[in-house]
Design a protein with these regions (language model features):
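Short beta-strand-centered interaction patches in the first periplasmic/extracellular domains
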Residues: 68-72, 77-79, 110-176
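Polar, S/T/G-rich
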Residues: 93-104, 126-132
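Short solvent-exposed strand/turn elements
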Residues: 28-29, 70-88, 272-285
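Long, hydrophobic/aromatic-enriched structural stretches that serve as scaffold segments
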Residues: 67, 73-74, 81-84, 95-96, ...
Length: 285
């Protein structure tokens, strides 16, 4: 595509979806002299390269919308095969073994960084649904460089430089806070307890009582919840910021305090301006 014909390009992904999505709008008025050469059709391959020629998206056109002024195409990468294919049978083993079996059935290579053990069964589920049950909610499932990747959170957080931040919408809540948890037996006797003393001092006590089902002390610790922090941040364009990564910011006046997981990203090229929008969830300290 010739750049003057492009009105906008958006490239994004969320943790709840397996596929990255690219949307591009091509103006018909400046494009009509060579639009026939583009021959854009559903199923066509779409590649997006950065300024250095590195491929940052490879997928195919799934939707085309035309009006008198523009043509908008929507393309997905190979992650779409995880949501558009239902699988059947019983899947059992470690998360890695299940992911490997699914990747083999779909003809996609597997790459991962260590998944925990689980057993998944059930016919008629999408490949993405089975993978999500196998590896848990906190892991990023994607197809990168042609390979199925399942990555866990953690690792270094990228500092958000204040001079690069364009817009912030933040939210903090203690509506789901649990700062004391008690595990009881059949007779009501306390078997284990855990608490966050600092949160109790600052916010008052919010207690949860749980019946025993496993290791009582581990149950009590797992039930504790701190305040929740979330944000939507727009920064100057940065392709290195993407779903599954982490950022860090300490700007209480913006509602940003600490380390955040990136749960969704959208890179936008519009009217000559490149920006990146991030959906963030605070990481408990």
């Amino acid at each position: 595509m010739v750049m003057p014909a492009l009105e906008s390009v958006r490239l994004g992904k969320t943790r709840n979806e397996a596929a990255a999505c690219l949307t591009a709008t091509v103006l018909i008025a400046p494009a009509d002299t060579y639009f026939l050469k583009l021959s854009v059709a559903v199923g066509d391959v779409v590649r997006l390269l950065d300024d250095g020629g590195k491929e940052i998206f490879l997928g195919s056109v799934h939707e085309l919308d035309r009006d008198p002024e523009a043509v908008t195409l929507t393309a997905y990468d190979r992650g779409v095969y995880l949501t558009r294919n239902e699988l059947y049978g019983v899947y059992a083993g470690t998360g890695r073994q299940i992911a490997g079996k699914i990747a083999g059935e779909l003809g996609v290579p597997l790459e991962d960084d260590g998944l925990y053990r689980t057993i998944v069964t059930g016919p008629g589920e999408s490949a993405f649904s089975i993978l999500r049950r196998a590896v848990g909610e906190g892991r990023e499932i994607a197809v990168r460089d042609g390979a199925l990747t399942v990555t866990k959170g953690g690792g270094g957080a990228v500092p958000l430089s204040p001079e690069r931040v364009l817009e912030v919408f933040g939210r903090a809540s203690m509506g789901n806070m649990v700062n004391r948890a008690v595990v009881t037996g059949r007779n009501g006797r306390i078997l284990a307890a855990a608490q966050n003393t600092g949160d109790i001092t600052a916010c008052g006590r919010f207690q949860r009582v749980i019946g025993k089902s496993g290791d009582p002390q581990a149950q009590a610790k797992a039930a504790l919840r701190r305040r929740s922090l979330s944000a939507r941040v727009t920064v100057l364009g940065d392709l290195s910021l993407r779903c599954g990564g982490r950022v860090e910011a300490h700007r209480p006046q913006w509602g940003l305090e600490g380390v955040y997981d990136i749960t969704a990203h959208e890179h936008r090229w519009e009217k000559g301006v490149f920006t990146t929008s991030l959906s963030l969830e605070g990481v408990e300290g």
